[in-house]
Amino acid sequence: MSQLPVILKAESIHKSYRMGATRVNVLKGVDLAVHEGEFVAIVGASGSGKSTFLHILGGLDRPDKGAIQFHGRDLNRVGARELNRFRNKRVGFVFQFYHLLDELSVLENVLLPAMVSRSIVGWLAGRGAARKRAEGLLDQLGLRERTGHKPYQLSGGERQRVAIGRALMNQPELLLADEPTGNLDSATGNGILNVFETLNKAGQTIVMVTHDERIARRAQRTVMLADGRAR
């Protein structure tokens, strides 16, 4: 794996938050390099800064100090508009609580990133191809018969698979998953991990946060966060 190029690199990441009169240092110089096609699990206890670090990796938050490089480019030096494009087109996010829109169908939820990334004219011109891709993703995820359903009509595992389809809609180079099985029973969570393994075998780069070391072992490499540092 080390012979493949590094697509994401974190260098000496620091992050703190203020709680009343106290400043809490969450990350104290975290380093990480993720190679193309790698499946990395970041594991640590509750409050160790795992989710904070993942959000910084994906451009959802900025560090107090340190650099996040994507293909060698420092995201801290990127403006807000370009950072939005980066998050929409090059990174896919999967969260513990799905964040699906109940008023939209399963298919429409998966289509959302494609709709957001295009102008009205561009969307009208390309919606047929986008719909075909969304339907293909749902088919691969075992949801062919659910495309017209609303999220509230689905099981937890089905909703998480919809969220994965949405994350993959724009063919991101990097998939970031924050406790993707944390809201699921063990059998359903295992099914989601099987999906991640299949995606990774097809070349998808994945960074997953979990508090469960058993889940982390499904990844190719595990990074432990403790006392604000990576081990």
What do the PLM-derived regions correspond to, one by one?
Residues 227-231:
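Conserved switch/coupling elements of ABC/ABC-like ATPase nucleotide-binding domains
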Residues 5-225:
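ABC family nucleotide-binding domain
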